[in-house]
């Protein structure tokens, strides 16, 4: 079926763009924003409003498919594409992408996604990850609408996957309101929590003291508020700050994490981004050493790779090297939804945990599509998004998941009746 027309509409994303380099360098908070000058190219201030561009494909059958172009909160660092400002890219979409979309005969998602994600701009470079992300979302939605099926079923059929009809564990993030938002997560029985946003050495504390105190508080809070059968996974994102407070001494970090694991037991413990060693090569070596050191200590702490692990090629390098027990597949950073699917499947095939993440700075559209990718590919966990308020993102993603599972179950029963 052909695409008759395309519209590009500027909108808002679910959070903000933050200059991580400036924050790590000591930018002082000022209400909800930060004082000081930005350090990362493309930023006009340390924190600025998140933006999105909706791509709407008008199909011959009258259906309208939608995908949202968005980028991560911490854009422009650790090998990522620059900060995504809508006004800078709508003209590119109109002049360079739209002529290729209008009249395109859309049959299968994989074929279309491969074609459009490999397009290059006038300088011969692949388009910004945000453009590829939004475009492939819209293409997936379009193929589902053409076939009158769910996006999860499109992925399963085209990639030869079995739909298990089981929910994927959801991982919510607290932001700086790590106490209030943890309460919300406990009351709503979030599977993996709380993220914590330990993105500054002062938050993590000298030799991890503040992180330990918070983890112990969280354990007790779950006993106080949680149901007796509620045992969530503890997942803390420390943005390399353990490296800062331990002077990148990986042995000391491993010892600290092994002790922390004992203190939070019986909750499983996952630590994302324990160090940021400044380059992909050093990061791979460091995370590999740290995970192996933990194993020798008899620890089951899972190290989660994030920084420097951005695109499909990066993810394969981290997985092949054993650099951590889990990789975050940060959806906007990979660009195409097709690459996201392949990344999850590759990690699972190699025995590495696949954390299908993303960013608080996404939208309801991209979050719902991530749910379908998750149901089809079966990662270890899905990040709750967009926003940092817990309830909104959890409502969007949990409800989309449960609705889709109900549809899939009904479709399965109907199919069984037909063949029976």
UniProtKB/Swiss-Prot annotation:
GO terms for molecular function: metal ion binding; methylaspartate ammonia-lyase activity. Optimum pH is 9. Mg(2+) binds at residues 237, 272, 306. Optimum temperature is 70 degrees Celsius. It stays fully active upon incubation at 50 degrees Celsius. Even after 4 hours of incubation, the enzyme retains more than 95% of its initial activity. CDD domains: MAL. Pathway: Amino-acid degradation; L-glutamate degradation via mesaconate pathway; acetate and pyruvate from L-glutamate: step 2/4. Belongs to the methylaspartate ammonia-lyase family. This is Methylaspartate ammonia-lyase 1. It comes from Carboxydothermus hydrogenoformans (strain ATCC BAA-161 / DSM 6008 / Z-2901).
């Amino acid at each position: 079926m052909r695409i008759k027309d395309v519209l590009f509409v500027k909108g808002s994303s679910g959070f903000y763009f933050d200059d991580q380099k400036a924050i790590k360098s000591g930018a002082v908070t000022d209400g909800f924003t930060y004082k000081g000058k930005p350090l990362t190219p493309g930023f006009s201030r340390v924190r600025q409003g998140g933006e999105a561009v909706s791509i709407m494909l008008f199909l011959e059958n009258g259906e309208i498919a939608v995908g949202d172009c968005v980028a991560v909160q911490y854009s422009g660092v650790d090998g990522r594409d620059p900060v995504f400002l809508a006004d800078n890219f709508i003209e590119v979409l109109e002049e360079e992408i739209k002529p290729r979309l209008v009249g395109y005969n859309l049959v299968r998602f994989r074929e279309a996604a491969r074609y459009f994600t490999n397009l290059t701009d006038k300088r011969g470079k692949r388009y910004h990850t945000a453009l590829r992300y939004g475009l492939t979302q819209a293409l997936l939605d379009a193929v589902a609408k053409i076939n009158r099926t769910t996006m999860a079923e499109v992925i399963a059929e085209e990639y030869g996957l079995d739909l298990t009809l089981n929910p994927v564990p959801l991982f919510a993030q607290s932001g700086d309101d790590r106490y209030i938002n943890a309460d919300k997560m406990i009351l709503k029985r979030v599977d993996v929590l709380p993220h914590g946003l330990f993105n500054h050495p002062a938050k993590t504390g000298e030799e991890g003291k503040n992180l330990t105190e918070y983890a112990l508080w969280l354990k007790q809070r779950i006993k106080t508020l949680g149901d007796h059968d509620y045992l969530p996974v503890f997942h803390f994102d420390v943005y390399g700050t353990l490296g800062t407070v331990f002077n990148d001494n990986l042995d000391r970090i491993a010892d600290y994490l092994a002790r922390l694991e004992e203190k939070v037991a019986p909750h499983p413990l996952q630590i994302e981004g324990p160090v940021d060693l400044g380059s992909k090569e050093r990061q791979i070596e460091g995370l590999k050493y740290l995970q192996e050191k933990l194993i020798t200590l008899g620890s089951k702490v899972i190290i989660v790779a994030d920084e420097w692990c951005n695109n499909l090629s990066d993810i394969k390098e981290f997985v092949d090297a054993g650099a951590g027990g889990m990789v975050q597949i940060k959806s906007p950073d990979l660009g195409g939804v097709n690459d996201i699917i392949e990344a999850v499947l590759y990690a699972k095939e190699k025995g590495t945990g696949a954390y299908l993440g993303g960013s608080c700075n996404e939208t309801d559209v991209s979050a719902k599509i991530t749910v379908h990718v998750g149901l089809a590919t079966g990662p270890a966990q899905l990040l709750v998004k967009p926003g940092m308020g817990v309830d909104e993102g959890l409502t969007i993603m949990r409800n989309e998941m449960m609705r889709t599972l109900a549809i899939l179950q009904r479709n399965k029963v109907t199919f069984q009746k037909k063949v029976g």
